[in-house]
Design a protein with these regions (language model features):
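Catalytic core of membrane glycerolipid acyltransferases/transacylases, capturing the structured
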Residues: 1-40
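Generic beta-sheet signal
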Residues: 14, 35, 62, 94-96
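A conditional alpha-helix N-cap/helix-loop micro-motif detector
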Residues: 16, 39-42, 73, 114
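Short, glycine/serine-rich, charged loops/turns that create anion-binding
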Residues: 16, 66, 98
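Glycine-/small-residue-rich active-site loops that bind phosphorylated ligands and cofactors
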Residues: 18, 40-41, 68-69, 142
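A cross-family acyltransferase "interaction/gating" segment
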Residues: 21-25, 57, 71-153, 165-175
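Polar-ligand-bearing catalytic/cofactor-coordination segments
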Residues: 34-36, 137-143, 156, 160
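Soluble extracytoplasmic domains of inner/organellar membrane proteins
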Residues: 43-59, 63-76, 81
Length: 179
């Protein structure tokens, strides 16, 4: 919601979200592209993303294929980045850091763990003030990149960018090892 609030973008999400009552319908009506992990859908989705990008319609997705607690960057799955290469469009990395009132990483805002989405929304609505810090890194030109080289570069930029963001906004620094 933080990233999608500022611009018209299409969001890439796991297929299970499409079946969620209310939120699934909202996501679908907002133009979300749903992908079934491990089903071979990634080729079809990549083609759709390429078509959107060629029309200058941004597509938002989590390259780690999940959300995290914000303490570190997980492995980037780069297959979808191939769409940006095919469409000859830059890749824009955005990082979010949720900071609680004590100046540490907030553990309620990120949708992680084994709770339902409804439970998560309830916890978010009940929590004290949290600040979402959003940073957009310089765009990465995809020209001359393979999926592998672009994935490695995105991984490196995300790790360094998150470390820099933590240094800037947190009172105490989490362990920044890559997962």
């Amino acid at each position: 919601a933080v990233l999608g609030s500022g611009a018209r973008v299409f969001f890439l999400a796991k297929a299970e979200i499409e079946k969620w009552p209310v939120f699934g319908k909202l996501a679908k009506s907002g133009g979300t592209l749903f992908i079934q992990r491990g089903s071979g859908d990634s080729i079809k989705i990549r083609e759709q993303i390429t078509a959107f990008l060629k029309q200058d319609i941004p597509v938002l997705f989590f390259p780690e294929a999940t959300t995290t607690d914000g303490s570190k960057v997980k492995k980037v799955h780069g297959r979808i980045l191939g769409a940006a290469i095919e469409a000859q469009r830059d890749v824009q990395i955005c990082l979010i850091c949720y900071v609680n009132q004590q100046g540490g990483l907030d553990q309620v805002s990120p949708f992680i763990g084994n709770i339902s989405f409804a439970e998560h929304v309830k916890k978010v609505l009940e929590m004290p003030q949290v600040t979402a810090h959003l940073v957009a890194l310089p765009a990465i030109c995809t020209a001359g990149h393979t999926v592998e080289s672009l994935t490695a570069l995105v991984q490196q930029k995300m790790v360094q960018g998150l470390a820099d963001l933590h240094h800037k906004v947190l009172k105490s620094q989490p362990n920044m090892q890559q997962a």
